[in-house]
Amino acid sequence: MDYYSSQITKLIEELSKLPGVGAKSAQRLAFHIISMPKEQVERLAGAITDAKNNIRYCRECFTLTDQELCPICSSSGRDHATIMVVENTRDLAAYEKTGKYQGVYHVLHGAISPMLGIGPNDIKLKELMQRLQGDVKEVIIATNSSLEGETTAMYISKLIKPTGIRVTRIASGVPVGGDLEYIDEVTLLRALEGRVDL
């Protein structure tokens, strides 16, 4: 990219490192940022820096938050006896958009994938098992319906069954290989309502 200044080239290169942003999209974003008013660029840069410096894991469910406990875990209006296990914070947000689920969550931050070298110790399973020491009555497994998601669901089910806690899996309706964050709210709600015991 010798036809751009080194500063523009550097911005395009950094933007293209973001997931889902190819070279052309990075170029469009770079030129858009450059054309923005300075104050707006500073707010954007500040928001990114603040998020990076202040966002952490909720100490209970491991979603991303800027407080010790996320708003869901700290809410007395939620059913803390029901835990929905999801792969990532985006999946949690997808279920929250339905407005119907009133339990709490546990975010694994991944799924078991032997092909990628991700085992049970690489995701938040130990922390899930520690949470089950309380008054939990049901664990709803809402991992993606991919091979990795199904593997993770079966592994979790085998871990929890001996405890006597009810273990359910969201119903199909979520397409095989589908990522929850891209599924519409009605489909997610039907999958939740049609969950089955494992």
Model regions and ranges:
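Cys/His-rich Zn2+-binding cysteine-cluster or related metal-binding knuckle/ribbon modules and their
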Residues: 2-8, 17, 27-92
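Solvent-exposed alpha-helical segments within well-ordered globular domains of core cellular machineries
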Residues: 9-13, 27-31, 42, 46, ...
